[in-house]
Amino acid sequence: MTFMQQLQEAGERFRCINGLLWVVFGLGVLKCTTLSLRFLALIFDLFLLPAVNFDKYGAKSGKYCVITGASDGIGKEFARQMAKRGFNLVLISRTQSKLEALQKELEDQHHVVVKILAIDIAEDKESNYESIKELCAQLPITVLVNNVGQSHSIPVPFLETEEKELRDIITINNTATLLITQIIAPKIVETVKAENKKSGTRGLILTMGSFGGLIPTPLLATYSGSKSFLQSWSNSLAGELSKDAIDVELIISYLVTSSMSKIRRSSLMIPNPQQFVKSTLRSVGRRCGSQERYATMTPYWAHAVYQFVITETFGVYSKIVNSINYSFHKSIRIRALKKAARQVKKE
């Protein structure tokens, strides 16, 4: 091979490498631009855009909001804040006495109509769903909040999970959510169609997701899977109902003080139900921390930033995040078992 031929080959290799470098550079610029735009959207959604006006969902016009799991925690706070916005309410939960107390509180404070239904959704009886149908048959409903949910009593390996706990989680988080939505969503479609002729009212379906569904969670495997299912189901439903002027949103939360989380004190990362619901209703229809996900929102600012960092660095399905999650819940399990052992000794 002559010197000129060698020089020519070297030039061709250089052009090839140079082209590859430009491709890498272009992809890097695209990634940085996308990341920057997502971060700006995060900031706008969380802090700069005004609060959502619920008049478009029928607030103060006699329309009803149906809330499941409404007697405690996040569900109870949804009831309070939706009543404050002027919605009549249908509250569904297990404990009659708690529902009656909340009914009186909301009717006295906000002068709205509050209907209550006490059923145990874990029983998965047809009569439960018939009761919901009868109660809601003649009501102009525009909003549904699928809040009812259940987790494990403590973190537990899947192979040691009791069958009843496993079945209850799937029944409450998935089966009941789907069946109740099948009952209420047609009522929302009907109400919106009737109202659109006059006022352009929209419908809204909110479903509580979880970081447990966002990130695979060892030692909470059944709960994690049930919430991950809701992500795909809710996104699919959003695509189906958009033509009917119904907004469907999955709400992702990290820890919130509640009886289910067993956390009593709030902190920077752990809001109380009032703070969490306020941030949710302020930002309905905005992705906040879920910038890469359709029809999904992570509304509380600390949760949103946490999700953004995980998503844009390691990724929610990475081994390192899975391992960290496992260690975190393993430590919770150890503490819970020690506490249970101490209580047994006292007895």
From Swiss-Prot:
**Catalyses which reaction?**
a very-long-chain (3R)-3-hydroxyacyl-CoA + NADP(+) = a very-long-chain 3-oxoacyl-CoA + NADPH + H(+)
Q: Where does NADP(+) bind?
A: V66, D120, N147, Y223, K227, V256, S258
Q: Tell me the route in metabolism or biology where this protein functions.
A: Lipid metabolism; fatty acid biosynthesis
Q: Which Pfam families match?
A: adh_short
Report the membrane topology from the UniProt record: Single-pass membrane protein
Q: Could you tell me where this protein is found in the cell?
A: Endoplasmic reticulum membrane
Enumerate the UniProt keywords alphabetically. Endoplasmic reticulum, Fatty acid biosynthesis, Fatty acid metabolism, Lipid biosynthesis, Lipid metabolism, Membrane, NADP, Oxidoreductase, Transmembrane, Transmembrane helix
State the InterPro entries in the record: 3_ketoreductase_fungal, NAD(P)-bd_dom_sf, Sc_DH/Rdtase_CS, SDR_fam
Q: What class of enzyme is it?
A: oxidoreductase
Q: Which protein are we looking at?
A: Very-long-chain 3-oxoacyl-CoA reductase
What residues make up the catalytic site?
Y223 (proton donor), K227 (lowers pka of active site tyr)
- Its biological function? Component of the microsomal membrane bound fatty acid elongation system, which produces the 26-carbon very long-chain fatty acids (VLCFA) from palmitate. Catalyzes the reduction of the 3-ketoacyl-CoA intermediate that is formed in each cycle of fatty acid elongation. VLCFAs serve as precursors for ceramide and sphingolipids.
- Species for this entry: Saccharomyces cerevisiae (strain YJM789) (Baker's yeast)
Q: Which GO terms describe its biological process?
A: fatty acid elongation
GO molecular function ontology, one term from the record: very-long-chain 3-oxoacyl-CoA reductase activity
Q: Which family does it belong to?
A: Belongs to the short-chain dehydrogenases/reductases (SDR) family.
Q: Which PROSITE patterns match?
A: ADH_SHORT
